[in-house]
Amino acid sequence: MRFYTDYLTFNTEKHREYINITPEVESALRKSAIREGMILVSAMHITAGVWVNDAESGLLADIDAWLEKLAPFREDYRHHRTGETNGDSHLKSLLVHHEVIVPVTNSKLDFGPWQQVYYAEFDGQRPKRVIIKVMGE
């Protein structure tokens, strides 16, 4: 089995943002030259997440509204006693998880017809990283 590692580094423009990173994941897969296996995509920050879903703007707005309903910003989070003000960002990241694993078949991401990889930022406007680890033959 072979392994290939790549990192994405970017600055998000907004405090909360959803970025389709599928092209970058596909680029890492091409660089790896791995034909069969799996690819791990993981946010390297505790207030961010990675998910697989449809790249449709209405759905992204629905996801954002759902996350805000389940984990709204509040002054009274215990985490804020540490001097931080991002308790809701931590909770939102728990809801979407921080990583995904995608099968690789014939040197391609083995997705359904609408699936895309998204990076979800909940405490942005500063440098962030994502690790991409390709494993296989």
Question: Which residues are covered by each model-predicted region?
Answer:
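Active-site histidine-anchored catalytic micro-motif
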Residues: M1-E137
